[in-house]
Amino acid sequence: MHWLLSLVAKLPLGFLQGFGACIGELVFWLSPGYRRRTRDNLRHAGYNEAKFFTKVGRNAGRQSMESIWVWYRPTKAVLSRVKISPQAEHIIGSAMTSGRPIVFLTPHVGCFEILPVWLAGTHYEKTGRRITILYRPPRKEILRAVV
């Protein structure tokens, strides 16, 4: 599995995002349970418009392919794609050098896997701060070996 994912990660990020969107939409429309849960969750959150519903599958697929790209690419390649405002850089840099504990809450929007790579690549050398990440292991055994 690792060899296949590392091969996939060699493809350009833009291609993977487009491919992920296609696969995500296909899975979305072929899985009635996934569509039902998505519709229910969106309604519970107050999003009743169809435009939100139709984007979920595409964006889930994009996120999956982006994650593979982040996990299997060299740190330098990943960091070259990060765009951060000077204000955010200052706030995070000050927090990292303060010595106080920091909690980063990363919603599952976009490629949330990139934050730990960015922190390690930009601030770890300067501060020596450790990073602890809380997550729920994947339910599927094949994915547990990857994550």
Describe these PLM feature segments.
Residues 1-111:
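Membrane-anchoring hydrophobic helices of lipid-metabolizing enzymes
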Residues 100-147:
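Catalytic core of membrane glycerolipid acyltransferases/transacylases, capturing the structured
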